[in-house]
Design a protein with these regions (language model features):
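Glycine- and acidic-residue-biased ligand/ion/polar-headgroup-sensing regions
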Residues: 78-81, 88-108
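Short acidic-glycine-tyrosine-enriched beta hairpin
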Residues: 80, 107-128
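N-terminal post-signal-peptidase region of extra-cytosolic proteins
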Residues: 57-61, 73-81, 85
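A short, N-terminal "cap"/entry segment at the start of jelly-roll beta-barrel domains
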Residues: 24-69, 156-164
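Bacterial N-terminal signal peptides
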Residues: 8-20
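Positively charged n-region of N-terminal signal peptides that target proteins for export
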Residues: 1-4
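Short beta-strand His + acidic residue motifs that chelate non-heme Fe in jelly-roll/DSBH
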Residues: 83-85, 103-104, 125, 130-136
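Double-stranded beta-helix
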Residues: 33-35, 112, 134-164
Length: 164
């Protein structure tokens, strides 16, 4: 009886492992590719009106304009691209994927007070933290946070949506 129980447990464990293998194979064969992006399939598009034109944005997960929920976006910026001093009401997590992303804290854009973050760097910015940024070389950052993504410019005249 005890031997039969062990045999039954062994067979059950084996079947669970086989089931997992089929699940992994199904994912790898494209059944869930809408959740997977390679560099070639990233859906780059224009930035929203409240971000300076010239960069490209890709929404990878969620909806940054929704009233709630998580989002993940990538921002591709050309060399010299600047983001004026601003703040967000919700936390922002930033990972530098390529290039150099310079970030400064405060209400005035000052290149002497900026720290350089290179590929692989990560930072999280608490709500209401005033900051500004600049790309050195073509730079790609991934930003993750909670919706809605809101930019509040320290100087309202820096808001590009007012100039469009």
């Amino acid at each position: 009886m005890k031997r039969n129980l062990y045999l039954l447990l062994a067979v059950f464990g084996f079947l669970c492992c086989v089931g997992q293998l089929f699940t992994v194979a199904a994912h790898n064969n494209g059944y869930h590719t809408r959740n997977i992006f390679t560099p070639e399939t990233i859906p780059w598009g224009p930035v929203p009106p409240f971000i300076n034109p010239g960069a490209q944005l890709a929404v990878l997960e969620g909806d940054p304009t929704a009233s709630t929920g998580d989002y993940t976006v990538r921002l591709k910026m050309p060399d010299g691209y600047k983001i004026a001093p601003h703040w967000h009401p919700l936390r922002e997590n930033v990972t530098v994927l390529s290039g150099t992303f310079k970030v400064g804290m405060g209400d005035q854009f000052d290149t002497k007070k900026m720290a350089a973050f290179t590929e692989g760097s990560f930072a999280f910015l608490d709500p209401d933290m005033h900051h500004y940024a600049m790309a050195c070389g073509q730079t790609i950052v991934q930003v993750h946070g909670q919706s809605p993504l809101q930019f509040n410019y320290v100087n309202p005249d820096d808001d590009p949506s007012r100039r469009r």
